[in-house]
């Protein structure tokens, strides 16, 4: 089977949507097709506050989610929905998506991973600071699509949100305390469940749970092809970059999510480059 109908089957099987997708190639039984990963958090705008039944709104929501549909709101002004430009650039915090980085940065990840796989650059893939796991899910999905069974995807996070700034040691983090933001506190079990929903939770996915200063220097990582930093703060960026940079293979990628948006992160990278 080929074409749109087959794409719909694949989307249904993997619980994903076809709107604003990131697609990557894969093959099964000699048939090449595009596997679709949802990027935008909503597929359909369903107002459950006016749902007539049968069943309750919560039951309807659960049923829709099993088919890859996402509920965007429970009523209200449609103008309050997330702006597509914000979502594309990753400048909002979507309520249900597995990632907040947006389509442009996801395309950057896709391009980097494709280059690593196509050119045979050795090493594993890691993201430090994963939120709900979307970027690392994409990484693992691409390994599957390329038939790479050797590399691992490392999922590194405190799974407790960000640390409170230690301004005595890292004065550049002063005024950037988001340690109490509950939206950023996504537990490891939830991230594992997100991987599992795509059928991608397996031995090639390794979790590093804890603060970066406590986990990354001792992590059993020999070589990296991609190091993606998403720690926001000077401290978190430094705690990840210092132990891992030397493990990046020649031709590999270091991607810094917050370099253009968070001054503490930018300063940490600039200082590291000056010192090295």
Where are these predicted regions, by residue range?
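S-adenosylmethionine/decaboxylated-SAM
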Residues: 14, 28-44, 57, 61, ...
């Amino acid at each position: 089977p080929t074409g749109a109908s087959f794409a719909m089957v694949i989307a249904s099987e993997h619980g994903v949507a076809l709107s604003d997708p990131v697609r990557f190639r894969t093959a099964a039984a000699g048939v090449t097709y595009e596997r679709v990963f949802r990027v935008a958090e909503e597929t359909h705008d369903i107002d459950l506050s006016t749902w007539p039944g049968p069943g309750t709104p919560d039951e309807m929501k659960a049923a829709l989610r099993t088919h890859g549909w996402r509920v965007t709101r429970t009523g209200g002004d449609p103008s309050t929905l997330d702006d597509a430009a914000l979502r594309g650039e990753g400048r909002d915090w979507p309520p249900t998506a597995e990632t907040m980085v947006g389509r442009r940065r996801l395309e950057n990840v896709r391009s980097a991973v494709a280059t690593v796989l196509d050119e045979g650059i050795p090493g594993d893939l890691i993201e430090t600071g994963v939120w709900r796991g979307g970027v690392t899910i994409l990484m693992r999905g691409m390994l599957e699509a390329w038939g790479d069974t050797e590399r691992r995807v490392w999922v590194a996070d405190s799974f407790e949100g960000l640390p409170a700034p230690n301004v005595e040691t890292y004065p550049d983090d002063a005024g950037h305390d988001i340690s109490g933001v509950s939206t950023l506190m996504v537990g490891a079990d939830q991230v594992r469940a997100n991987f599992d929903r795509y059928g991608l939770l397996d031995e090639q996915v390794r979790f590093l749970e804890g603060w970066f200063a406590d986990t990354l220097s001792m992590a059993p990582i020999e070589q990296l092809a991609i190091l993606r930093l998403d720690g926001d703060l000077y401290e978190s960026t430094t705690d990840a970059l210092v132990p891992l940079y030397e493990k990046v293979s020649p031709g590999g990628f270091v991607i810094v999510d917050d370099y253009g948006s968070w001054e503490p992160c930018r300063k940490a990278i600039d200082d590291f480059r000056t010192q090295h």
